[in-house]
């Protein structure tokens, strides 16, 4: 793909995402106002967090939310607290499934999930709108599909990870990730982690900062729109830095990239 094609591609992506987000926000807001006018359910007034599930242990975690803030904390046992009556929980064969049904309330809702710090087989999180905060995400396989909202992950440890960014600030403050496939959306990205194996960072719209732990890296650059700085040196298209065993392919989007 030529630079001209890349420019057209990323401007088209940015404009399309902006239009989708604007139209979706307007529709959701309008529907919420209408529903709120006619539907005065008692559940909409519940703000107190209630514990709805406890367990000694699980193998995997699967979370699917529409418009609820997600907080993941570490604890010795597994438990769930929420003030959202539309949250449903079920466990089967060690897989804990948390799903939100038909929540179009305008009131903010929270979901707090307590899990042990031990490594799970898989963590799968898909969100629509709302913030995400996690003390630790430790899993052999990590899959995040993000919507609109700020994401803050204090620590990530994963053997293989796929992250599809949404709209909003994304941050990993510490980690060890093997074979990361990261597709940024719109918003600033900060990742501080050791990246092992073969990794791909496909940037979107906004500034991306990679604070790599260790020095055993080989960096390959595919430049888009904006500046790419590797150790404060401006990179050009198809340039390679280092000859380490851990490979990181950086595909530029719209905005500055700093490694």
Annotate each PLM feature.
Residues 1-7:
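N-terminal Lys/Arg-rich, disordered targeting/topogenic segments
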Residues 7, 15-18, 50, 238:
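Generic intrinsically disordered, low-complexity segments enriched for polar/acidic and small residues
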Residues 9-28:
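Hydrophobic membrane-insertion alpha-helices, especially the h-region
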Residues 29-122, 126, 131-137, 141, ...:
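Short linear S-[DN]-x-LW-Φ motif typified by the pepsin-like aspartic protease active-site region
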Residues 153-156, 160-259:
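Short, surface-exposed interaction patches in beta-rich subdomains
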């Amino acid at each position: 793909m030529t630079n001209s094609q890349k420019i057209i591609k990323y401007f088209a992506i940015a404009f399309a995402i902006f239009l989708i987000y604007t139209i979706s926000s307007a529709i959701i807001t309008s529907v919420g106002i209408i529903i709120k006018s006619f539907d005065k359910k008692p559940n909409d007034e519940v703000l107190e967090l209630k514990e709805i599930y406890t367990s000694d242990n699980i193998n995997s975690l699967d979370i699917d939310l529409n418009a609820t803030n997600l907080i993941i904390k570490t604890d010795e046992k597994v438990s769930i607290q929420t003030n959202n009556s539309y949250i449903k929980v079920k466990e089967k064969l060690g897989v804990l499934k948390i799903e939100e049904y038909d929540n179009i309330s305008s009131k903010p809702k929270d979901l707090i999930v307590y899990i042990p710090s031990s490594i799970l087989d898989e963590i799968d999180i898909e969100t629509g709108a709302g913030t995400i905060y996690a003390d630790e995400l430790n899993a052999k396989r990590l899959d995040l599909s993000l919507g609109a909202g700020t994401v803050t992950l204090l620590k990530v440890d994963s053997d293989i990870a796929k992250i599809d960014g949404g709209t909003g600030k994304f941050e990993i403050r510490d980690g060890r990730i093997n074979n990361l496939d990261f597709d940024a959306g719109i918003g600033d990205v900060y990742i501080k982690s050791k990246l092992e194996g073969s990794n791909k960072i496909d940037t979107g719209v906004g500034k991306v900062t990679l604070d790599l732990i260790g020095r055993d890296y080989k960096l390959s650059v595919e430049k888009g729109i904006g500046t790419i700085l590797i150790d404060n040196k401006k990179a050009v298209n198809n340039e390679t830095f280092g000859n380490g065993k851990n490979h990181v392919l950086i595909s530029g989007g719209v905005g500055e990239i700093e490694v």
